[in-house]
Amino acid sequence: MVLTQQENLSVLVGQRFVCLLGKDLQVDPDTVSKWPWKSGIVRAASHKDLHCPEIKIFVEYDDESWENRTWLELYGPTVKMFLVEHNLVLADHASPSNPSVSVQCPAMVYKVLVGKFSLGSTACLQFLGEKDKVFLSKELVKPVRDRETLKQFMQDNKTFNKAFQELIRKSVDESRLLQAARNIISMPINVYSMDPSMQWFSGTITNVRTASRALEIKCEQLPSLKIIDPALLHVVLVHNYGDQNDKSKKPRASKRKSQDTESEDQTEVKQTRNEEVPSKDVTQKTSFLTYRRDDGKTLVVVDNPKATTNNLFNYMTPATEDQQKVQQSLSSKQSVPVGFGETLLGCAATTPGIQNAATPPPANSPPSFGAATPQGKGSQNLPGDTTVLNGDANREETNLFLSAAASQGNKRSMGFGIMESPSTFSSLSTMPSWSGQPNSENGLKSENLFAAFTKSSTVFPKGFEFSVKSFPEQKMLSVTDSPKTALQKTCVPQQEQNVIRKPENNHTSVKAIKPQEPPYTKSPNKTDGVTYPKSILLNPQKLKRLQQSGDCFVQDGSCNNIAPHLHKCRECRLDRFGRSREQRDSAVFCRFFHFRRLHFNKHGMLKEGGFLTPNKYDAEAINLWLPLASSVVDLDLDTAKYILANIGDHFCKLVMSEKEVMSSTDPSKQVAWKRAVRGVREMCDACDTTIFNLHWVCPKCGFGVCVDCYRMRKKSLSSGEEGNEMFSWLKCMKGQLHEPENLMPTQIVPGKALYDVCDIVHSVRGRWGIKSNCSCSNKHMRPVSKPVVKEEVKPSTPEPEPIKSLLAQPNVCTVPDPPAIPNKPPTPACSSPLSWLTNFPQTIVNKENKDNLFASTSKSEHKPLPSFASFGKPVSALQTFGSSILTPTTSNNSGFLRNLLNASTLKQETSDKSTPKILDDIFASLVQSRPLSDFDRKPQGLPIQPSLMGFNTPHYWLCDNRLLCLQDPNNKSNWNVFRECWKQGQPVMVSGVHNNLNSELWRPESFRREFGDQEADLVNCRTNDIITGATVGDFWDGFEDIPGRLKNDTGESMVLKLKDWPPGEDFRDTMLSRFEDLMNNIPLPEYTRREGKLNLAARLPTYFVRPDLGPKMYNAYGLITPEDRKYGTTNLHLDVSDAANVMVYVGIPKGEHDQDQEVLRTIQDGDADELTIKRFIEFKEKPGALWHIYAAKDTEKIRQFLKKVAEEEGHENPPDHDPIHDQSWYLDNILRKRLLQEHGVQGWAIVQFLGDAVFIPAGAPHQVHNLYSCIKVAEDFVSPEHVKHCFCLTQEFRYLSHTHTNHEDKLQVKNVIYHAVKDSIAILKANESSLGKL
């Protein structure tokens, strides 16, 4: 485990540095320590990109007044050396307790950022707790890899403790600010002032912009400052932990007291007290502090918790009273709340008395500290130190994070991070943190710091957990339902449309604040109306029967309401840290809801009774997963066959992988069944991937991990590489690690429905003659081998007749056969008009294509720039190879060539069904890459050929006959022609869409009029800098007026992009009229509409969380000048889903001359073909954007090429970052030529004109360069042809860092595949009676 200050050195602001300055400085390389080093801290920066040669930083120097601060040109001639703090290491140092002895001490090592002199083998270090920098040999510096290395040193050194705590606080706060986490909304901050008269000014965060990572603030000292970027200006969070500024009260000593319980293996509890007596005339407010970690996880701790009058070990409560309170709690209204950050503190239950306890008053004033605030002198309580409490004699001895268990006789539950049994670091369970005394700089106290090292981590401060140990005048912690103060309000960020069970990585958290209006209102939640039957415990007769019989029943409410004294799931423990009562009472958040079984013991106490098993489903649960034609909407027979033919093999692979995992589980472990919950997306707590079926769950807290994360963890443990995993695992209730062997295998699909559906798929494909190339051993109607489901009995509820018939499949209990190696498909017996092509040697085709690829490229590199006059030639008919080979050989217009070939081979045996697939591949090779003659290269106009592909489908070909362009967006046959190219992974363009749109809705004036006052994130396309303090109106004012654009520091008009606007909300909710206008006129509605029959996302039942597929707007100025050709409006990237991007408006700005000539040169430089140029010159169409799209199969070649270029330029390639997913590259003409020459990768150069819709396949890398100012709208969809790319990309995105927007799996590809197949076979089975008539 290496403890790193940050994930990377991407941000300098707030970091400490060591530098060497002087233009003519001369140094002795042998005396590095005697060089005139200067140290300090970076307060501001001019650019985010550290590699920008013009970057300047604003610094303060140590041992100098802050007024002597200055700007430094980082890569200028004055800066000879510049080192910044990097990570924590160990090095030899004199022992603090015995200077004559040398020990391994922790130190911060500095990394060279600018080095014009060589340090050789010398490293710069700063030992924690010391100010001086030292220079040691790198051989003496060791990384912190062992948890035990700091244990003894931490116990003995108070100075180190304080410095280490400060390091943790600083890193966590920086991470929260730089990531613009929503849990910092309403928090007070100190912002560094550039005004020479003051160093800091204070403010409050009113909102965050997660896309640009900017903060919206309110500052009374500087009202004009509304938006700041913490990556450019130093910002410090101000924590309100209690009364720390009241100088009239002196700190008193504190006392640690241990008490033993009646249980022999009770963990020793150490309690820390703070004796300050708060004023009685101040109203107390309970607040909840949240910390955002570098890995995106959220920690929640309690500030000023409520006190209790109950004795610490007063566990016993009459059963009748307990049941009465449970019934009262269950009567609350249910609602679906917003997701919150996960609490990593172990949480034991509290007695009802504790929940109703009074609340002591708060501290008088919050602290104010920042990077430059001197350290306080508050006292600290170190392990082993015993102090005397000089307080009120009547006060109780309490531990703030100790909570009594409500279960009768359960005296071992200590809660809140206190280990239930002695552990490796049990002696340090009360390790102090930032002192709560008035003079202390920090107010937070931490639990055992070594518990932080028990969690797998690769980056500091991942794995570090925080809790509060002591506050002024606080008694035992009471976690209550909600703050009872009448004036107190809760600021709740806007809810998502559905609940996502991923609390650790959710940006939302709740923090009690002073009475004020929330920064933005909460939108209604679609699942607010979801209701569940009342708990069985509310029925007196049923409750009595259950108590007498001891029968098990399913938990039908949240843990807090049903079983507060039993193990609580992670969500219910978080519920007690700040949700309103209505939110807490919602059972939908509980991970044990309809999952865990309970029963009453002989004493009438509620106990755990295990979990549901796969055979315990009911009709409602199983119907969601079975192919029932009555539940299928908007799916016809032909479409069902097409979908099954395209994704049936992927479904089989999905089932085979599930079977493989199931067969590898421990036979002695019972598989649990977790039923799907409406409006909840089950996600892996480690990698954020949506969980489809099999996963592993902790029976104590509900922590769940996917199959891949489980395997990775087991592999790392078995190989002894613990701590090196890509994904860290959260800890269990009381700080214990989650061990793989303690997790239980769990499935979501009930019973054997998954394997039954797989049987039906093979049966249906055989009956309907649908081609299949899956590797299943039961490919030809053989029953699938189903894993054994233990305790297989009849379901308790009767099944409907359709279910019984569908599930009436033989159950063969065998291990799945290994995947069969498919043999080469035999040649069909009959011959078709082009049957000779089936034996055409594809290797020759590929070789010929490759040879001519370079030949055609070399010829096109030196094409002269055509003039306007050169395009005045007469228009003649365009005859392309694509049109001739795809024209049917007969006069029958009913279908094109592939339909003809399919019809000729349909009567053959099953072995003959591979012919169309072979022809598809050959057509793809021939159409994409055949040698181009001079005739093909010559532009011959843009004719409309009504019968070109067997349909009345007007179209033509671009990109040297490699790009299909459909000319009539309303043609009903478009989708038949479209899918022939689409299935080959080619992009497609549809022109003329703007003729159907309401142009008034898409004009810049309409947007300026409706939304001009909204604040927005503007991006400088030339520098990628974020422009703060701007409005939507500022952007639209310069859309078609260059002099009216915002200017940079040098007075030059900026090329801006309006990023992620409208933000957050559904496009339909924000711009309903535009949404309807687009959806009513978007081409190929079978694919692009939300309910399109070929949009597989529409197959996902409303029971599930639907993926957000748009529409999304992309608005940006044009990059016109020759220097702008190296910049991209949108850099090279790829998307997990297919997309249709429509150019709805092109604005030609005023104020510049010869724009047409510059645009023409840019189009020519972008490798556009002559037909494209003809559209611009002769037909006077408005070009909007230049696209470069590459085939998905070439992604890895492009990735390796960009990594090689990055290494050549001296850039790093971190393992959790990706040159394509990072969107950090734009391939200009030089790079595109290198890519073609070195890797043979050629893309499609497409100019998108007004009204053009560009269809981009999933997984296809693409980039965009705006020629003029553009308004584009994109709609995503999931097509059957590209599901395989969606699935592969989901796996890729797992390995991205948590800061990537694509890291989270929002598409749910496995769920989409399953339900699309399920609906398809339901339609096919319902129409089996018509088979004889075909």
Curated annotation (Swiss-Prot):
One GO cellular component term: cytoplasm
Reactions listed under catalytic activity: N(6),N(6)-dimethyl-L-lysyl(9)-[histone H3] + 2 2-oxoglutarate + 2 O2 = L-lysyl(9)-[histone H3] + 2 formaldehyde + 2 succinate + 2 CO2
Keywords: Chromatin regulator, Cytoplasm, Dioxygenase, Iron, Metal-binding, Nucleus, Oxidoreductase, Transcription, Transcription regulation, Zinc, Zinc-finger
Region: Disordered, residue numbers: 243-288, 352-382, 514-533
Positions bound to Fe cation: H1133, D1135, H1262
GO molecular function annotation: chromatin DNA binding; histone H3K9 demethylase activity; histone H3K9me/H3K9me2 demethylase activity; transcription coregulator activity; zinc ion binding
Stretches assigned to the JmjC domain: 1089-1294
S-S pairs: none
Keyword Cytoplasm annotated: yes
Textual note on the cofactor: Binds 1 Fe(2+) ion per subunit.
Subcellular location: Cytoplasm; Nucleus
CDD domains listed in its UniProt record: cupin_RmlC-like
GO biological process: regulation of transcription by RNA polymerase II
Keyword Oxidoreductase: yes
UniProt-listed PROSITE patterns: JMJC
Main location: cytoplasm
Database matches in InterPro entries: DUF7030 (IPR054294), JHDM2-like (IPR045109), JmjC_dom (IPR003347), KDM3AB_Tudor (IPR054503), PWWP_KDM3B (IPR054504)
Described purpose of this protein according to its UniProt entry: Histone demethylase that specifically demethylates 'Lys-9' of histone H3, thereby playing a central role in histone code. Preferentially demethylates mono- and dimethylated H3 'Lys-9' residue, with a preference for dimethylated residue, while it has weak or no activity on trimethylated H3 'Lys-9'. Demethylation of Lys residue generates formaldehyde and succinate.
Protein family (similarity comment): Belongs to the JHDM2 histone demethylase family.
Comment text on domains: The JmjC domain and the C6-type zinc-finger are required for the demethylation activity. Leu-Xaa-Xaa-Leu-Leu (LXXLL) motifs are known to mediate the association with nuclear receptors.
Full protein name: Lysine-specific demethylase 3A-B
Organism: Xenopus laevis
Gene of this entry: kdm3a-b
